[in-house]
Regions:
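Bacterial N-terminal signal peptides
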Residues: 2-13
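Active-site neighborhood of phospho(di)ester-bond hydrolases with catalytic His/Asp-centered motifs
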Residues: 63-65, 88-96, 114-117, 174, ...
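Divalent-metal (often Zn2+) His-rich catalytic cores of metallo-beta-lactamase-fold enzymes
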Residues: 215-266
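C-terminal regulatory/interaction regions
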Residues: 263-304
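Core dinuclear metal-dependent hydrolase active-site scaffold
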Residues: 155-187
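Conserved beta-strand hairpin/beta-sheet module of binuclear metal-dependent hydrolase folds
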Residues: 28-78, 183-195
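Active-site HxH/HxHxD metal-binding segment of metal-dependent hydrolases
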Residues: 77-157, 161
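Boundary at the C-terminal end of the N-terminal hydrophobic targeting segment
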Residues: 14-20
């Protein structure tokens, strides 16, 4: 037996007996596990993102697989509590490690992995960095931090339809926003949108792509005909327009205050200390993430 398959089989056996993550059916046939609001630098354990699955009449689609093989195996075991149908697709909403490292749990016959056309390259570029995090926080050796890249790729501003059996889902890819690898998944039966990290509720939004692109993508999503949104982090909401507008307002404020700081020749550290502070009571982990967002956008905006 090849080593990678032995490892995957062995790991499934270890973790299958005691799943520790719980799922809620937020719409008919749509199950979500909410990750904890923890920062990667603070007690990261691979379970900080929302993950879940959609059950059709013939098959199942997994939406994000978690931050470790352990979480992926617990997800796989939990699915069997709700359905005996096969997992047909695993869809990653973007490249961040808390959403992709459970993929290896689902390797098998007739399982396709779906993602943004830029996702395979982005995963490869971050592989060594992610391995260091997995080793430091999860005690996972590098040779056991297994990346499974998508084999079905979607280009920006394009959508593809996949049928789970009388249940069609639409996967749409975007230009740079939260990252360069963002996709959303729309369940057409229930008008439910899995937004990935294009939406944060409660937790401070993260910019790892482009703030202007993020603002623009939110405008596009606001035009959709949907009833429920599942964010990448936080509570699913039917008040989804308010949630996106709250996030977008934060970005617009941050953009404008960083631009003003640059125009006034204010340095990066002072800008980190001051920009966006009026939003501090509205978001969790604000003191950690707001500064990172400024550190990301300040150098780019200096050249605008």
């Amino acid at each position: 037996m090849p080593l990678i398959l032995f490892f995957l089989t062995f790991s499934v056996f270890i973790y299958a007996s005691s799943p520790s993550i719980e799922f809620e059916e937020v719409a008919p046939g749509i199950f979500v596990h909410q990750g904890e609001h923890l920062d990667v630098d603070e007690t990261y354990h691979g379970d900080i993102a929302n993950i879940g699955f959609i059950v059709g009449e013939e098959s199942i689609a997994v939406i994000d697989s978690g931050g470790s093989l352990k979480i992926g195996n617990e997800l796989k075991t939990a699915i069997r509590k709700f359905s005996k149908l096969p997992v047909r697709y695993v869809i990653n909403t973007h490249v961040h490690l808390d959403h992709i490292y459970g993929n290896a749990s689902f390797v098998g016959e007739n399982v396709d992995f779906i993602g943004h056309v830029e996702l395979p390259k982005a995963m490869a570029l971050r592989k060594e960095f992610y391995e260091r995090i997995n080793l430091e926080y999860l005690d996972v050796p590098n040779d056991q931090s297994i990346q499974i890249a998508p084999n079905i790729l979607i280009k920006p501003n394009e959508s593809k339809i996949f049928d789970l059996g009388n249940r069609k889902i639409k996967v749409t890819a975007y230009s740079i926003a939260h990252t360069k690898t963002d996709v959303t998944i729309e369940d057409l039966n229930t008008k439910t949108l899995w937004a990935g990290d294009l939406l944060f509720t409660e937790r401070t939004p993260v910019i790892d792509g482009d703030i202007h692109g993020f603002i623009d993508v939110i405008d596009k999503i606001l035009m959709l005909d949907i009833d429920l949104v599942i964010p990448g982090h936080g509570t699913p909401t039917k008040k989804w327009k308010e949630a996106f507008l709250k996030e977008q307002n934060y970005f617009k404020l941050l953009r404008d205050e960083v631009r003003l700081a640059i125009d006034n020749d204010q340095d990066l550290q002072l800008t980190i200390d001051t920009a966006g502070q009026s939003e501090s009571e509205k978001w969790e982990l604000f003191d950690i993430q707001n500064g990172r967002n400024i550190n990301k956008i300040f150098p780019t905006m200096e050249w605008e």
